[in-house]
């Protein structure tokens, strides 16, 4: 009997140790980003910088998660491919036990992942993917902290109206991002009866020569060229349009914020001046306390100012940690409820919410949309002219 009691006591002690160890396991947050072609690896690295500093913030100033548990980042490369993105999400959820997955940059990847996520139940937060259906399908698991296609298009139609442009050439990659923006531009221009002449040309994201379609653009004599390429095709279009004499005589608008990256002037030393581009953050914008901490930590580590991709990567990871705290659980259903019903601190002064709103605004929080212009070679993006400022969810 004494031996039995000793064994039972030992078993209880071992169980207690195991449970304590389990309770102290880190909270894993998944980061799915493009780190290799045909994805945009520069975007992936910038988002990763933000995510890694977010872990430092969570385990430092924030004081951990659920008491004394640390946060940990698990990173997967989506390669900008849907099949790789789905496999990466499955690994993060099934093998690494991530409580949520964020970092998504390519819309096609995020859309494909969400079809799997709605079955597995672990939520996703789009960091820089804008296709309407990411949130427009109203999946409980799908959240976003980035501008959506209709808002981006509304911003550049404002720009087109202000400039009095009528003939618009749109060169769009055949991805959900590219096709979605082209279709949304057609839709809104018809609804507003803008009487625009739209030339819409498409190309494969893996294209290495855009000369044939750029020659069609040149023959069209547009007032504006909208470059809806991501990563290498976007850079290629800038250079080849200049070689063919389309730009700078005809202005070009880049559909996202690639020109703010430190590498931009290395790639386009002679062709970058005069370009217009979309941005989501102005250095005049007020940061939250967490955002100020991040900006200082980023500059100390990388010797340069943070850009939007890094800021939003940081924000999404700390939002997930806050949601775990508010839910008092890592259970996906509890996490989703917390995300839907609470307010969260991010890098902006405004708090972030994910209301069950109508249409594409479901589970969506958006930064402002800016259109900036470089007016000189090697210009710091923070000195670029602000041509259009279009409201998002942030002030």
Put a short name on every predicted segment.
Residues 2-11, 23-395:
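Extracytosolic ligand-binding ectodomains
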Residues 17-23:
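Sec/Tat signal peptide C-region and signal peptidase I cleavage site
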């Amino acid at each position: 009997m004494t031996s039995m009691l000793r064994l039972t006591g030992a078993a209880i002690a071992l169980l207690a140790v195991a449970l304590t160890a389990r309770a102290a396991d880190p909270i894993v947050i998944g980061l799915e980003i493009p780190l290799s072609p045909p994805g945009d690896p520069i975007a992936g690295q910038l988002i990763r910088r933000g995510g890694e500093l977010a872990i430092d913030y969570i385990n430092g100033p924030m004081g951990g998660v659920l008491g004394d548990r640390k946060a940990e980042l698990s990173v997967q490369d989506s390669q900008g491919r849907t099949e790789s993105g789905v496999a990466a999400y499955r690994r993060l959820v099934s093998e690494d036990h991530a409580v949520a997955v964020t970092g998504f940059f390519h819309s096609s990847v995020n859309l494909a992942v969400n079809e799997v996520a709605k079955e597995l139940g672990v939520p996703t937060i789009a960091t820089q993917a804008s296709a309407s259906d990411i949130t427009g399908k109203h999946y409980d698991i799908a959240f976003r902290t980035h501008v959506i296609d209709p808002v981006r298009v509304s911003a550049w139609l404002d720009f087109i109206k202000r400039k009095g442009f009528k003939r618009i050439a749109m060169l769009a990659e055949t991805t959900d991002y590219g096709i979605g923006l082209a279709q949304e531009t057609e839709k809104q221009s018809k609804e507003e009866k803008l009487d625009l002449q739209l030339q819409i040309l498409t190309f494969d994201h893996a294209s290495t020569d855009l000369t044939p379609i750029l020659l069609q653009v040149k023959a069209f004599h547009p007032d504006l060229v909208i470059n809806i390429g991501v990563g290498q095709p976007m850079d290629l279009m800038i250079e080849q349009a200049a070689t063919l004499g389309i730009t700078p005589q005809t202005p070009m608008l880049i559909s996202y914020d690639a020109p703010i990256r430190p590498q931009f002037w290395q790639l386009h030393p002679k062709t970058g001046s005069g370009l217009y581009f979309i941005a989501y953050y102005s250095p005049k914008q007020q940061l939250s306390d967490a955002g100020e901490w991040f900006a200082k930590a980023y500059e100390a580590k990388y010797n340069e100012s943070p850009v939007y991709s890094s800021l939003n990567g940081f924000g999404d990871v700390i939002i997930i940690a806050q949601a775990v705290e508010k839910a008092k659980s890592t259970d996906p259903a509890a996490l989703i409820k917390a995300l839907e019903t609470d307010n969260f601190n991010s890098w902006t002064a405004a708090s972030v919410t994910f209301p069950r709103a109508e249409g594409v605004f479901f589970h969506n929080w958006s930064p402002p949309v800016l259109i900036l212009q470089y007016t000189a070679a090697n210009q710091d993006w923070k000195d670029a002219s602000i041509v259009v400022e279009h409201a998002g969810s942030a002030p």
